[in-house]
Amino acid sequence: MNKDDDKEGLAMFSALIDGIKPITQDKRHFRTPLKTKQEIALKEQQLHANSYFSDTYQPLLPIQGPMRWLDDGVDSLELKRLRRGDYQPDLLLDLHGYRQSEAKLELVALIQACVKQQSQCCCVMHGYGSGILKQQVPMWLVQHPMVKAFHQAPKEWGGDAALLVLIDLGELPHRR
């Protein structure tokens, strides 16, 4: 191609676009919507739940007999009291129908509510069978620093389908 062809092509192009105006920007630019306080609180709660509970951690829990666990430094008599039903749970959590991620959040919320209300014992109902929650809930409870012990609940509180959980309230006055 030479300069004459370029000039002819440029002239033809100019003739074709003669009378066309450039488009003006008439579109609105939208910012990303700001998160609500509820969304921020939920995200924060999820972060706390994920920092407490790992799905890959496998604690040493009993294979035979009732599900039970006792933290180091806690009197073994506490486990016996849980088994006998000496502790009456003040708060109940029913996890039937929950997904794992939702169950983790609810479990953290239950433990926080126990501390806030100075409730030393709570009941977590995970359901019968060999479902995911029945396997995961004890593993999650072992990982939480506020949990002192748990034991399979007596019949009146759910039996095989529930756990009684003993919460560490620190130096706060305990209720029984």
Swiss-Prot record:
GO terms for MF: RNA endonuclease activity; rRNA binding
Q: Does the keyword Disulfide bond apply?
A: no
Q: Which domain of life is it from?
A: Bacteria
Query: Which key words tag this protein in UniProt?
Result: Endonuclease, Hydrolase, Nuclease, RNA-binding, rRNA-binding
SMART domains membership: SMR
GO biological process, alphabetically ordered? rescue of stalled ribosome
- EC number annotated for this UniProt entry: 3.1.-.-
Location of the Smr domain: 93-168
Which residues fall in a coiled-coil region? none
Question: What InterPro entries does the annotation carry?
Answer: Smr_dom, Smr_dom_sf, SmrB-like
Q: Which PANTHER family match?
A: DNA ENDONUCLEASE SMRA-RELATED, UPF0115 PROTEIN YFCN
Self-association and partners: Associates with collided ribosomes, but not with correctly translating polysomes.
Q: What does this protein do?
A: Acts as a ribosome collision sensor. Detects stalled/collided disomes (pairs of ribosomes where the leading ribosome is stalled and a second ribosome has collided with it) and endonucleolytically cleaves mRNA at the 5' boundary of the stalled ribosome. Stalled/collided disomes form a new interface (primarily via the 30S subunits) that binds SmrB. Cleaved mRNA becomes available for tmRNA ligation, leading to ribosomal subunit dissociation and rescue of stalled ribosomes.
- Family, as annotated: Belongs to the SmrB family.
What is this protein's record name? Ribosome rescue factor SmrB
Q: Which organism is it from?
A: Shewanella putrefaciens (strain CN-32 / ATCC BAA-453)
The taxonomy runs: Bacteria, Pseudomonadati, Pseudomonadota, Gammaproteobacteria, Alteromonadales
